[in-house]
Amino acid sequence: EYYCCADAAGFERQIIEDMDRAEALGAKYAVFHCADISNEEVLGNYALHTNEEIIRATASLINRVMRGRKYSFTLLFENLFVPGMTLINSAETELMLSLVEYENKGIMLDTGHLMAALRLNGLLTAQKEEGAADAILNVVAAHWRVKKHILGIHLHKCSLNMPIEEYTKVIAPAESFEERSAQSYARIMALDAHSPLETDAMRRVIDAIAPRYIVHELSARTPAEKAEAVRMQLKSLRGCCP
C-alpha cells in the first residue's frame, strides 16, 4: 500500500529507477530517508523496530540496489524523528555510514527533524531558536568522528511550542488506509511544520558544519507563499527583522 508494489523486489526496482533517473538528470546528490514507521505506529505512539534494526535494514537495502552500479552523485542519508537514523546517538550514525558500501556517501542534516527528535527525547525544552541552535550544536559536537560527512543541511524549524504530550497522545485509527494516512500526516506535520526561521541563531550551525549544500525546505500552499517563506528565512539569517 505504501509504495504501490507487491513485494520487496518491487520496492528495490523503484529505488533503482529513482537512482537511474537522478543520474540521467545530472544530480549532484540524492537523498534517502533512513526511517521506517507505519500509520498505526504514528497514531498509537509506539515503534515496532529499533533505530539499529532500521539502520541495518536500510544499509542492507542500499547495498543490494547499488551493488554493481556506478553513479556519479553523492548519496546523502537524512535524519528523521521517527525510528531510524535520528542523529540523537552518534554511534548509530557511525554505524549507518560504516555499513553502507557505496563510497560516495554522506549525511543530510535536517534541522527541523533534529529539533523534533530532540524534543521527543527530552533534550530540547527551549521554545526559542537560540536554544534549538545550542542543542543542534551539541549533536554536531558529538558527531566529531563523522562531522566531515555532513555535506548538506535542510534548513527550517519544527514547532517549538507544540506540547509534546499533544503529539504523543494515542489517536484511534480510521478504518481505511487513506484516512489513516491523512491522520498520521496531520499529526506529523503539526510537529514537523517546516516553518521559516525567524532569527539568525541557526547561522552558528551553518558555520560549524560548513555544508556543501543548503536547502530552504519550507512548507507552503502556493509557489508565491513558498517564495515569501524563503525570503523571510534568508532575511532572518542575515540578522534582519522579518
Locate predicted features.
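Active-site acidic/histidine proton-transfer and metal-coordination neighborhood
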Residues: 1-106
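Histidine-acidic metal/acid-base catalytic patches
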Residues: 12, 26, 102-109, 115-242
